[in-house]
Amino acid sequence: MVNAKPRLTVGITTRNRPASLQRCVESLRHIAHLQPEILVFDDASDEPVSSMLPSRPHLRVIRGGRGSGYIVGRNILMSEALADSVLLLDDDAALLESAGIERGLDILARDSGVAAIAFAQANEDGRPWPESMQPGSGQSVRYVAAFIGFAHLLRRDAFVALGGYRESFVFYGEEKDYCLRLLDRGLGVVYLPDALVVHAQDASGRTGQRYLRYVTRNDCLNALYNEPIRRVVWLLPARLALYYKMRFRWRIQDPAGLRWVLKEVATLAGAALRARKPVSRRTHAAWRRLRGGTAPYPAPRN
């Protein structure tokens, strides 16, 4: 008997966070009735996660061999997924209920102009994070510029057509780049502010120094990939100046950080320039409007 194609694939990337991963996988009980395919990308954890996770139907672990980063892992998960809709989760995320996920699935099934669903960040007790730390403002369903990568629902065919996440980013910033390219294709991101997903940030593997370096580096790469040259010439210095602003605001000791960023950008600039496809002025204008939070998503007609 041939198994039916699942309606949903859940993809989780993890590295050396066994407790967080177990909590994340256990939280999928909320959507068990959807019978999702569950894929876990183990990014070369010191102890393979396959030995920690309980055996369950439709769960498969994909073991990476070299610690290539979660962006590469997400691309692998998307390539392996069987479903048309894929819920990507960080290992320190956890579901609180099923309604938000089902609502997102319904939007993707009904509206071919929507390619991604953004969810709201919440504490473990279900309290939402401050509005400034969410994909958008307000409590109504709306289009937004980008989702937050900790939990997002993607239309797989759009992801494949766009070439997925840029693996050169390694860590951080892939959401903005991907959503900007989606917008340039005429596709949207819808934010469900009442669809809360836990983001219990696990400190393992996180450092302020790494975050600062990669955010600055990837903002520069984003400009090289997506901006017209007239904007690149001032955006690159502006992005580099922002490194110092963030460093002092967050009190991060990183005396060699800017040198590292400059070396990385110089190394990757040639490939980025060869692959660049600047987005249109119309896309930039739409992006600014969406960041302003003034684009409500229309309720479906019965």
List where the protein language model places each region.
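N-proximal low-complexity "stem/linker" segments adjacent to membrane-targeting elements
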Residues: 1-27
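Short, acidic, metal-binding catalytic loop of nucleotide-sugar glycosyltransferases
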Residues: 26-35
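Glycine-rich, basic loop-to-helix element that forms the pyrophosphate-binding segment
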Residues: 64-81
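A short, conserved alpha-helix in the catalytic core of glycosyltransferases
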Residues: 146, 151-154, 158-163, 168-196
